[in-house]
Amino acid sequence: MKKTLLTTLSTFALMALLSACVPSSTESTAAKEGDSSAASVESTAAQTGESSKTVDENLPKIGVIQLVDHTSLNIIYDAFSKELVELGYKDGENVIVNFKNAQGDMANLPTIVQSFEADKQDVVVAITTPVAQAAMSLTASTPVIFSAVTNPVEAGVVSDLNTIDKGMTGTTDAVNVDKIMDLAMTISKDAKTVGYIYNPGEDNSVSNLAALKEYASSHGLTIEEASISSSVDLQSAASSLAEKVDIFFVANDNTVAESMPVLVKVANDAKKPLYVGADSMVMDGGFATVGIDYTDLGKETARMVDQVLKGKKVEEMPVKVFKDDLYTYINTDTAKTIGVEIPESILSDEKFVEIKNKK
């Protein structure tokens, strides 16, 4: 069954996600599980200051660390918050939720982690690979549930997906590079050169580049790389590749995702399809991907936190992989902008999700 999502091309406002009633960032005419009417859990510690609400400090504490404010991660936290409500948690009444955002600066992570250690959180949620790696220092005393860690083994946070021996487990947003590139080769049949932009400081992006190179070597493709250290480098990196490549591919790099509109404009102006690693990046104007629903990722993260608060050990919970829950997301407005036709075989597939920009 085809789904259609209408989406804006702007990043969620973080404070909107923390409000008591959060409107959905997308409108779906056929969502997998229906629209949730649950309000988000309000954080007792917003990123810019402490809440004035008086709470019982003896309540269980959930510390949440988010790396940066961008669509993918905001979807995860929004879904996480709503699922906590569905599970019976209400901030300030039977739980305390402490949310911190590193504002895209990894140098902020040690300070946040140390503050959570001092405050004795009962469980910490680490959203993204860099955050999970920074939170490893907590695991001697505090269970950690990570979310959106692309390759937990390579990141060093678990020995393997079923052997939880480092004090943390969670959910992975592993990018299926092969399936995304298969989609690219189906739609962009004449493509020979792929432009890949990434931050080499993000292990998730490095591992995805390795997978892309492996695919390229067996399919006769050439990879043109451009590395960036911050989102301000994205414009020049994308522009430098635009004349050299037939298509762009960016995985789930947080530095890129933070400034997706910049990359989208360069790609669209050059009429080059931009294949991406997350559904949310298609919502931000990217052309297409094959991947998971990040809402599911946030919900499952909340369920794992619930299990920890009820006494289950993280060692008893394997990493959750969404390998069978993949959808093909295509922004049909972007397709029109760059003049690309989508094969009927894709449009009629029950796993096809059409993304349209909200007018």
Regions found by a protein language model. Give the residues of each.
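Hydrophobic alpha-helical segments within soluble ligand-binding/sensing domains
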Residues: P152-T193, I292-K312
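Beta-alpha junction/loop-to-helix N-cap segments that form part of ligand/metal-binding clefts
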Residues: A102-S159, D253-N268, K272, G277
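Bacterial signal peptide processing site
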Residues: V22-S24
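Extracytoplasmic "Venus flytrap"
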Residues: E50, D56-E57, K61-L87, N98-A107, ...
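Structural motif
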Residues: I96-A118, S227-L241
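An alpha-beta-alpha
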Residues: I62, F80, T169-A216, P318-T334
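C-terminal motif of bacterial Sec signal peptides marking the signal peptidase cleavage site
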Residues: L17-A20
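Hinge/cleft segment of the Venus flytrap/periplasmic-binding protein
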Residues: K310-K359
